[in-house]
């Protein structure tokens, strides 16, 4: 199946010519900016510092400003902002004063989706991986989709790409409820967990109702793809008044996995689909959570008529996403080496899934985790869960909380987490005040065969490459690109 529609209707946003992104280096912003650049719009943007992301956009023709100043927005026809941008930002204030429209990033994404067959992936966990798998399988099926992803797709070298077909595949962000702007043709709900609860006034029922409202943005002929294994998704399923397909390990699911075998980084399983032949597939990712992500992908690909051969190829050829159990390489230690992994997981459910994946794929190896909590509010709200989950590592080093703009909350810091985990009696965590201290602290703790994971959503993401370059680990072997 090959679909190419060069005459695809494109967003003609009236009098809009120049689009300015406030915080253009953000993972949710840069992808939309790149697609708009490729559509021929003038794009400018500002961020607090230059980065490889802003340099990439600049190479495509974007005008990049370092720092936020009123004059940056002076010639814009519209400003795009994320929820992280303060309304007092001078560029936003100038735009409002001059009556220049200021729109959330999700509204701009919705404008792109309006002209395409939109596939929106929602859920507390697994959005980025599922969206990336969909992009890979659709490409293998000859559908050349446009995609906007919250992580760098290894095969494409970017988190966004303008395709030639009618399909647009994107993440749907529930963190600020902005996914309600989207009106896709197909929507996935991977799971629903307690996170970003300030958006929902601490009311979990409100969070559930918002997911149902999101699914009702589908047309009556659309499709809701829902994970039956998640108890909350199962709970809201009867409320969804749209066509649905379910997936999971449950025997009740429309599309389910059996005979799961994990061998290191590879996971093999059999897919059972109603009215279809069983399908033998493999993915280059460990863990049952990634089997579920693959099942969501298979459900949509099957519904869209993508061949089984293309599904198998797209899944087996998937090269992963940046910071989603990304293997950096091998660090030399006495008697052998240590596998170094970088991971974005920052919720107890995500940490638990990674630990389970390691235990399943490498049962005889010790797990050393360097973890950085993300946001004081999340640490406070999920404190007991963090204590329980992090205590399942063999060795644990805790960095101070990455604030993400929040003020400290008493009792919700990493020193207190260390104390609480230590009281459980299973292990004695080590507190790290600064990331620069990691190499000399962690090296004496490592043994040949260990798996070392740097995990979290903050600046812990820079530590794996630093360890690879550290003189203390001279001779480190970089993971070869697949």
Curated annotation (Swiss-Prot):
Gene3D superfamilies: Mur ligase, C-terminal domain, Mur-like, catalytic domain, NAD(P)-binding Rossmann-like Domain
InterPro entries tied to this protein: Mur-like_cat_sf, Mur_ligase_C, Mur_ligase_C_dom_sf, Mur_ligase_cen, Mur_ligase_N, MurCDEF_pg_biosynth, UDP-N-AcMur_Ala_ligase_MurC
Pathway: Cell wall biogenesis; peptidoglycan biosynthesis
EC number: 6.3.2.8
Domain of life the protein comes from: Bacteria
Localization in the cell: Cytoplasm
Function recorded in the entry: Cell wall formation.
Name of protein: UDP-N-acetylmuramate--L-alanine ligase
């Amino acid at each position: 199946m090959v679909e190419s529609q060069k005459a695809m209707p494109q967003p003609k946003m009236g009098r809009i010519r120049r689009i300015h992104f406030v915080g253009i280096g953000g993972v949710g912003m840069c992808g939309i900016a790149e697609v708009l650049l490729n559509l021929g719009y003038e794009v400018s943007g500002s961020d607090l510092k230059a980065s490889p992301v802003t340099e990439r956009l600049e190479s495509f023709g974007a005008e990049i400003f370092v720092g936020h100043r009123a004059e940056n927005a002076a010639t814009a026809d519209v400003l795009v902002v994320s929820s992280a941008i303060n309304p007092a930002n001078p560029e936003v204030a100038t735009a409002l004063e001059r009556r220049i429209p200021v729109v959330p990033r999700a509204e701009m994404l919705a404008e792109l989706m309006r002209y395409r067959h939109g596939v929106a992936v929602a859920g507390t966990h697994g959005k980025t991986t599922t969206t990336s798998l969909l992009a890979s399988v659709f490409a293998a099926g000859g559908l050349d989709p446009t995609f906007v992803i919250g992580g760098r797709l290894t095969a494409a070298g970017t988190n966004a790409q303008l395709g030639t077909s009618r399909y647009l595949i994107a993440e749907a962000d529930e963190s600020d409820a902005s996914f309600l702007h989207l009106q896709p043709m197909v929507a996935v709900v991977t799971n629903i967990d307690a996170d970003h609860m300030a958006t929902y006034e601490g009311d979990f029922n409100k969070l559930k109702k918002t997911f149902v409202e999101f699914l009702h943005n589908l047309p009556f002929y659309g499709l809701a793809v829902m994970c039956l294994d998640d108890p909350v998704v199962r709970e809201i399923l009867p409320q969804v008044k749209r066509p649905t397909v379910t997936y999971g390990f449950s025997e009740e699911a429309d599309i389910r996995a059996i005979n799961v075998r994990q061998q290191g980084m590879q996971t093999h399983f059999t897919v059972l689909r109603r009215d279809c032949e069983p399908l033998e597939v493999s993915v280059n990712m460990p863990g049952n959570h990634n089997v579920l992500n693959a099942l969501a992908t298979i459900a949509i690909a099957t519904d869209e008529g993508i061949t089984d051969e293309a599904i198998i190829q797209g899944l087996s050829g998937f090269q992963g996403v940046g910071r989603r159990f990304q293997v950096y390489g091998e660090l030399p230690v006495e008697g052998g080496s240590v596998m170094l992994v970088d991971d974005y997981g920052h919720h107890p459910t995500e940490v638990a899934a990674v630990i389970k994946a390691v235990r399943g794929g490498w049962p005889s190896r010790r797990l050393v985790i360097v973890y950085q909590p993300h946001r004081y509010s999340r640490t406070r709200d999920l404190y007991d869960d963090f204590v329980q989950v992090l205590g399942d590592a063999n060795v644990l080093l805790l960095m101070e909380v990455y604030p993400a703009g929040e003020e400290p909350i008493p009792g919700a810091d990493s020193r207190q987490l260390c104390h609480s985990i230590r009281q459980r009696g299973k292990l004695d965590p080590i507190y790290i005040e600064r990331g620069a201290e990691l190499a000399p602290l962690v090296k004496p703790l490592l043994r040949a065969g260990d798996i070392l994971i740097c995990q979290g959503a903050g600046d812990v993401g820079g530590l794996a490459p630093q360890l690879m370059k550290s003189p203390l680990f001279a001779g480190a072997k970089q993971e070869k690109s697949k």
